[in-house]
């Protein structure tokens, strides 16, 4: 492996390595909630994912003839994020294939640490979603007894997104939605725990809130203006219609792994835009694309596909912002020079 690239990756690891370590640590409270809702199988799945991520890292080190870096937790964090986006009944081979695709195709093919243009966790999830949709988008109800090894016989429920897509209403309280007491991915249901994780990352200065907030605000505005249940309020007053629209916003933002993606996917250091205006535009575009996928697509977790689409231009957003600032600065200098000359 090229020595210059190795040195560059080691320098990048010094700057962003703690982010991936914190992501791994923050998966623990989500895992506790998942085990409370679904038993011990989520613990085995996440342990398997952690092992797979580490083995992929060691395999790549061997193939590239470089020393294994024990302080690099990026592959493990991607593997855990993929696992927590899966249902508790997912088969082992589906999870393994998603992790291998995320680490090898999403990360290592592009050069490894810090060189990939697409979020590896989103890549792995997208591969599994397209290849095995019946495994990825069917979730067991909470408090279901799930066997540890073979969960093929467990009854799975239709997703909340199916109800929303058909124009129906969710018959769940706001507290149940916030606690994750509905059929959802293992780690993406409990909004309260996810918000706490996001605040921790922000306090630790691992993430910026601009991308996540612009993402959620954009999605919320689209839902408020164009709810999928609009026909239910045709003859209602303005106040009733506004309250109904706010309920639709709540239902859309608390389901479909929206909060999870805002915390664990959107702010990945090497796929998110780096400048403030770029991050805001990045979040707006991901939010708009996500609602487009949710309204007109066939997959529940459209945010991963939207994220991959916007990842392709995140670098362009940064470069455009830099060029814009340079243009404004040069224009201001010219105007100042003219003023001084007069």
Q: Can you say where each PLM-predicted feature lies in the sequence?
A:
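N-terminal signal-anchor module of multipass membrane proteins
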Residues: 1-61, 337-342
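Structural signature of hydrophobic alpha-helical transmembrane segments
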Residues: 39-51, 89-97, 177, 181-191, ...
């Amino acid at each position: 492996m090229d020595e210059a690239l190795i040195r560059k990756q080691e320098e990048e690891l010094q700057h962003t390595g703690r982010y991936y370590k914190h992501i791994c640590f923050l998966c623990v409270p989500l895992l506790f909630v998942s085990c409370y809702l679904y038993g011990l199988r989520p613990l085995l799945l996440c342990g398997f994912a952690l092992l797979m991520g580490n083995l992929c890292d060691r395999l790549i080190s061997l193939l590239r003839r470089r020393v294994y870096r024990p302080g690099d937790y990026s592959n493990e964090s991607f593997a855990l994020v993929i696992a927590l986006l899966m249902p508790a009944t997912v088969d082992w081979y589906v999870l393994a294939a998603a992790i291998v695709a995320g680490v090898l195709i999403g990360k290592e093919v592009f050069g490894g640490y810090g060189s990939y243009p697409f979020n590896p966790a989103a890549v792995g999830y997208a591969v599994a979603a397209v290849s095995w949709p019946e495994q990825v988008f069917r979730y067991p109800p909470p408090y279901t007894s799930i066997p540890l090894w073979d969960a093929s016989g467990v009854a799975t429920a239709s997703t909340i997104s199916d109800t929303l897509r058909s124009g129906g209403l969710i018959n769940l309280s706001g507290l149940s939605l916030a606690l994750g007491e509905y059929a959802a991915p293992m780690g993406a249901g409990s909004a309260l725990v996810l918000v706490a994780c996001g605040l921790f990352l922000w306090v630790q200065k691992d993430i910026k809130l601009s991308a996540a907030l612009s993402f959620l605000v954009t999605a919320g505005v689209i839902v408020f203006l164009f709810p999928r249940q609009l026909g239910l309020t045709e003859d209602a007053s303005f106040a009733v219609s506004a309250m109904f629209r706010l309920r639709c916003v709540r239902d859309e933002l608390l389901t479909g792994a929206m909060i999870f993606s805002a915390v664990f996917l959107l702010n990945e250091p090497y796929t998110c835009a780096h400048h403030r205006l770029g991050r805001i535009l990045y979040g707006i575009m991901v939010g708009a694309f996500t609602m487009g996928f949710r309204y007109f697509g066939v997959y529940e977790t459209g945010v991963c596909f939207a994220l991959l689409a916007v990842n392709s231009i995140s670098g362009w957003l940064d470069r455009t912002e830099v060029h814009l600032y340079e243009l404004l600065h040069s224009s201001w200098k010219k105007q100042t020079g003219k003023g001084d000359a007069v």
